[in-house]
Every structure is written in C-alpha cells, then in structure tokens.
From Swiss-Prot:
Any GO MF annotation of the entry: structural constituent of ribosome
Gene (name only): rpsC
Transmembrane intervals: none
A GO biological-process term: translation
Matches recorded under HAMAP family: Ribosomal_uS3_B
Organism (species): Pseudomonas syringae pv. tomato (strain ATCC BAA-871 / DC3000)
Any single Pfam family the record assigns to this protein: Ribosomal_S3_C
Gene Ontology CC: cytosolic small ribosomal subunit
Protein name stated in the entry: Small ribosomal subunit protein uS3
Family from the record: Belongs to the universal ribosomal protein uS3 family.
SMART domains to which the protein is assigned, alphabetical: KH
Keywords: Ribonucleoprotein, Ribosomal protein, RNA-binding, rRNA-binding
Domain of life of the organism encoding this protein: Bacteria
Length: 228
C-alpha cells in the first residue's frame, strides 16, 4: 500500500518554516519540547472560539516570543487588552521566562487549512450533511483564489453503522511537488455517533526563488493586420 508522508513535514526548509524555533543541548531539548506542547494545548483550550490557526514559539536569549495566528484577533486581545495580558502572565508563570505575545490576523480564513478543517468539523457537529459542508468549503476556497483544494472526512458519516471515507476535490493538489505551497491540516469532529476525522489540503501556488507564484491575467493575442 502507498505510504503518505506529512505534506508540511516534507517541505520544512523548502517552502515551510518550523513552528518552534530555538536551540537547546541534549539535556534541555526534551524540556523545551514538552513546554512547547503544553503551551499549545493551553492556548488552544483557552482560545477555542478565536479561530486560531497556528502558534509559533521562538526562544531568543532567556525570553519567549509567541505569535498567535488567528482570524478573530479581537477575541484574543479582549477589552482594552485585558485577555492578552492575562494570557501573558499565565504563560510567563508556566514557562518560567518573560513572554511576549504577538497576534497576527489571518485575512483570508477560507485559504487556511486549519480554519477550514475547524469549520467543516463544527458543521458536522451541528448535524449538517457532510457533502454539503465539504462542497461549501471547497467553493469558498476556490472563489477566494485557491488553485486547488481537497477535503476528506472519515468515520460514521451520517450515523452509518460502518465507518467509511469520503472526499471532495477541485483544482489540482500536487503533493509530489516540493515547491508547491500546500497548507495541510486535520481536525476532529465529536458527534453523537463518534469521532469524525477531517483532513484538508489547500494548494496556493508554487514558490519559485523564494517568492510566491502570482496569478497574472493572460494578455490578449495581438491582432493580425489585414492584407491590403
């Protein structure tokens, strides 16, 4: 059977960057790794309704800089910045070093793999038909400018006795092209029938020479002059 590598892991250092950036020797590496895991679990639990896509952690010189990528920055910041300050204090206590929090707004949530997966999962939990949820997400992504998108759901779809896998795709999703900028994410929908897994692949274009490929309208062909 075919073995499928993680679409983001294979592109690290090519078109994707690490979400944790720090250096540690053998004695502290495991401690830093475990601390990052706990920080992400804490933030994802606290910010469930904030549409958080990604959490980047940098550790420069006895400090920590955490960047939260969210489609709803107002929920993270809170009234007059009270919520983000409470988060900073809790994370400083948890990590044992001064923490700085940056918030990056996601302008196009329809093109973010994690947010699309969360949206489909939430619709499945509200008992929306899985085909309708997938088709709606695919159409929104293609309308915004995606070059291709694939969504796959697995589990007891529609309350069926036997679990199965269904998928829907539009455009092209070149998983074997390393320069292809593919955003991949997976999420779980907890329904009354059990857990349904949601996977999303979004192809945004190819990165050539460190620059994102841009869609340019084709120039009209020159008109031929009529012979006199």
């Amino acid at each position: 059977m075919g073995q499928k590598v993680h679409p983001i892991g294979i592109r690290l250092g090519i078109v994707k960057e690490h979400t944790s950036v720090w250096y540690a020797d053998g004695r502290t590496y495991a401690d830093y790794l475990f601390a990052d895991l706990k920080v992400r679990e804490y933030l994802q639990d606290k910010l469930k309704s904030a549409s958080v896509s990604r959490i980047d952690i940098h550790r420069p010189a006895q400090t920590a800089r955490i960047t939260i990528h969210t489609a709803r920055p107002g929920i993270v910041i809170g009234k007059k910045g009270e919520d983000v300050e409470k988060l900073r204090q809790d994370l400083t206590k948890q990590m044992g070093v001064p923490v700085h929090i940056n918030i990056e707004e996601i302008r196009k949530p329809e093109l973010d793999g994690m947010l699309v997966a969360q949206s489909v999962a939430q619709q499945l939990e509200r008992r929306v038909m899985f085909r309708r949820a997938m088709k709606r997400a695919v159409q929104n992504a293609m309308r915004i400018g995606a070059k291709g998108i694939k969504i796959q759901v697995s589990g007891r779809l529609g309350g069926a006795e036997i679990a199965r896998t269904e998928w829907y795709r539009e455009g092209r999703v070149p998983l074997h092209t390393l320069r292809a900028d593919i955003d991949y994410a997976n999420y779980e929908a907890h329904t009354t029938y059990g857990v349904i897994g949601v996977k999303v692949w979004i192809f945004k274009g190819e990165v050539i020479g460190g620059r994102q490929e841009e869609l340019k309208p084709q120039a009209p062909a020159p008109r031929k002059k009529a012979a006199k």
